[in-house]
Amino acid sequence: MTEELVQRIRERMDYYQPMVETDEQLDIQYQGLINRIVKRYHAENEVVTQFPVHFRLLSPYDKIVYRLVEELATTAVKYASGGTISLKIDVHDDAIFIISENDCLQTEKSLGYGLKNMFNKISVLGGQMQIFENNKRFRVEITLPIDKELCYENFVN
């Protein structure tokens, strides 16, 4: 009981301020986040990740992508119908690309609160999010432009 309570407190703290270690590589941080989500939901799915090796993102994009990975992994783990969940991040000079894909049960064409909130946040940042559901496969594609001025402003603050 105590261990479960401690875990829930850590998760709530992480919700308000992500557990992002400044000296730890993002691929390792994001993989740790996914592992915690899989453990929390007692998922038996295999989560295959493709992240650039030892990549870095300027602030605030490191935390923004952390939140996107958190929501995508949580959605996939909770609603996947089994099989493999794949999560890919690709970073270019001017944009971040994220793709999540998993098997799913046939569902109604509605977004849950998590995906709706994620869509709204991405839109505010000038990005795009597309959702595809075909042959019992659920795929989310995100394109998030990197605004260098936002990075500089965050650095100055």
Describe these PLM feature segments:
Residues 138-148:
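Short C-terminal beta-strand
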Residues 62-84:
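Conserved ATP-binding N-box helix of the HATPase_c
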Residues 96-105:
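Conserved DxG motif in ATP/Mg2+-binding regions
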Residues 3, 7, 18-43:
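Short beta-to-alpha transition helix within the HATPase_c
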Residues 147-157:
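C-terminal end segment of the histidine kinase catalytic
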Residues 108-139:
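ATP phosphate-binding glycine-rich loop and adjacent ATP-lid/helix-beta elements
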Residues 84-94, 132-135:
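Short beta-strand/loop element within the Bergerat-fold HATPase_c
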Residues 44-69:
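Conserved short strand/loop->alpha-helix "switch" segment adjacent to the catalytic nucleotide/phosphoryl-transfer site
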